[in-house]
Amino acid sequence: MKSQKKQALNPYLPSWEYIPDGEPYVFDGRVYVYGSHDFYNGYVFCMGDYVCWSAPVDDLGNWRYEGVIYPKTEDPLNRDGSMCLYAPDVTVGPDGRYYLYYVLDHAHVVSVAVCDTPAGRYQFYGYVHDKNGVLLGDRPQDEPQFDPGVLTEGNSTYLYTGFCGQGDKTRTGAMATVLGPDMLTIEEETVFVVPGCETSDGTGFEGHAFFEAPSIRKMGDTYYFVYSSEVMHELCYAVSKSPTSGFRYGGVIVSNCDLHIDTYKPADMPAAYGANNHGSIVQIGEDWYIFYHRHTNGTWYSRQGCAEKLEITEDGVICQAEITSCGLNGGPLIGEGEYPAYLACNIFCLL
């Protein structure tokens, strides 16, 4: 008799694991999630080394720990381990290898590591730089680099970065920089693709301007730029037919406090504690999902990954997903037995 598959829960990883900022990809029949690494009872963001988890595309409740794929001390700027590894992203280069892009918490340049397999041990590869060897982020015209998101098409890799806090008029918006086939050298100079809150007036992004967490996907001939907005708890998207220009605001994909959802509460009532958010979309089989994170343990620094199935209209509009306890399960959890309290997705509070 064939054994019954495990139910897929939210958070989708074991209760003791804290992988926020999840970037999901499907490689060779498995879903791999790359993210930063928080700790239980953490006191800052991203205290751990990069680890990876994966699951079969047809068994999304069966996650496997792939181990440490990149220790923080591997970067030459961080041999003493004093800096944290912030949110990463991964892309497959023209040579078929896997490239990991990241920024250290007290650096402003983009580091790159490489591996022959999706979840092997990545080795430091270099820093993104221009044709004169000057690092992106070190040049006078550069804004500090943060939260890299990457997409490779042919010999070009599109690198998206940026952080725009409210009131900081030195930051413009989300940036895109085109890299050459070596995955490090700038081929086309940086352009701004989505405005931050200080530059959003009259753009259509007002109220949902770029804050951080840029991520890029392609659906058909349309580029979907996923990002955390100025209100932090929501992941929004913008769309364009070009990877480096013409993005227009699309809407909210998910809020980690379910703001705007009115099916079971008033739309302006939060269903949980909302705070920063980071993630992206992925197609698994015939369906698309949004991976995001929520906050636990009464702190900002112990975040856990969740995922929800998406409804996408024929014209490419992503409808906001409601947060659940069973996002990857294909339906509700079985209504029998006991479930741990940490799966609860709605925690209403009277302040």
Q: Which residue stretches match the model-derived regions?
A:
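Carbohydrate-active catalytic/glycan-binding domains of CAZyme proteins
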Residues: 1-351
